[in-house]
């Protein structure tokens, strides 16, 4: 399993499009994408089918990590998004999501 965490340089409304474009190619990958634009912060967690099969749930992960950006969110087991009002917390939110993923994977 591979875990990728990155801040992306585009507006939050494009996170969903990118996630759904990449997901079919990433069976063994967990991705955490974050973006800050126009005073807004967004976080997305995308899990490949093999990762979901191991019991991970993107919605649970994004809800927990969103606390760092004073936000909330949700979604489906394979994809979830959160928005928040604290852009300066994005790095901590992405780290929290990565930590949760690795913990659930037994790393």
Indicate where each model-derived feature is located.
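Glycine-rich, acidic loop segments that terminate in or are immediately followed by a histidine
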Residues: 2-107
